[in-house]
Amino acid sequence: LKDGTGIVAAELVAIEKGCEELLSRRKSGWIVTDSEGAIGALRKWKSEDRVTQDIKRAIWQGEREAIDITIRIRGPKTETQEADRAAKKARDRPQVDLETYCNKAEVRQKFREKELTKWQSEWGKRNHRREHIGFPAVTDEWPGLNERAVQLVTGHGYFKAYYRRFKLREGSGLCECGEAEETADHVWWECTVEERERARREFTEAVGTRADVRQKLSEVHRDRLISELNKLADAIVRDDSNLEQ
């Protein structure tokens, strides 16, 4: 608004912004004004004022799109007079306050975005975690890994060394190949048990080396890799009942 803009003109601009907001949200609603002058301007059949014409066009557009925009005066005359006095004081302020409202779905979406941003920040601080290498971005979409593939990627699951580390089972934690502790990395890339070697060979032929896996897991288009990873995990991750007691 230009300096010296009248109260009625300022109120009409506020009403125009309210109409634009309702149309953009495709939502019916009430716009309440304290200015009798603004209501009087809108009641005139013809008006050369651009803002008044834009408000009427917005109301007509809303009718065509089944969006009901209603503009009315607030309360008794004494309240209007008080509002006019407040408006005169506000006219001299360097900025204009505009208050908008969100529906429940928009509030939930904004809250979700805020939480994801917070989780991403925390996740980014933990880049020593093995799963962080494959999944650097926090999202609310499941990547498609099955139960055993999740264990393989995170390192938490049906592995003897994992059970021994947290004292969940007694035993040495040694892999059935006898060469090292049974961890996710060992099972995935080092174990010499024949069926695991065969599954690893098929996986490597389809996907690539360990470095290739880390790179491709970070790509947007990774459906084939996820499928191959699920297949590999089913072949090399043992069931809980098969672990030593």
Curated annotation (Swiss-Prot):
Coiled-coil stretches are none
- Which reaction(s) does the protein catalyse, per the Swiss-Prot or TrEMBL entry? DNA(n) + a 2'-deoxyribonucleoside 5'-triphosphate = DNA(n+1) + diphosphate
Q: Which UniProt keywords apply?
A: Endonuclease, Hydrolase, Nuclease, Nucleotidyltransferase, RNA-directed DNA polymerase, Transferase, Transposable element
GO MF, any single term: endonuclease activity
Q: Region entry Nucleic acid-binding endonuclease: which residue ranges?
A: 106-245
Which residues belong to any copy of the Reverse transcriptase domain?
1-105
Q: What is its EC number?
A: 2.7.7.49
**Name of the featured protein:** Retrovirus-related Pol polyprotein from type-1 retrotransposable element R1
